Amino acid sequence: MQTPKNSDVLYLPIKQVYFDEIVSGVKSCEFREVKEGITANKYILRDSSGKYVLNAECTEADTAYFLDDYNGGKFPFMPKPYRYLYLAVGYAKERDTALVEVTGYSFEPYMIRKDREGKPKYAFWVIAYHLGRVVELHRKQLSL
């Protein structure tokens, strides 16, 4: 396998239970909340001027969009095109790690807030990375 470029890989710390489920093939998606600031900068594509790139399939060019817009249940921005997730259990120096292929993504709204007429207006969004094969797996050394 060709070594992936850093721009193709998203580093994510993860709990051991979820790591083990992904490695064993039980869990096929990894979910992360998209929030203004650091997390949005990790997950959402920006153009050369620093603005989030709109998803042309569900937005209008002359309309302003924000990360918490419900937008008819369609997330208005494009994700960064990661090809792999580099998963690491916790933050210790010795830990389990894996490089996992990303086969796709989707955005899912949750905690939808409605306007005065009862129509959905705002939402917190989660990006779901759809996972493929485990490309590399490194287990921490057990000390006796």
Predicted features and spans:
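Structured alpha/beta reader/binder surfaces that contact nucleic acids or chromatin modification marks
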Residues: 3, 7-9, 13-144
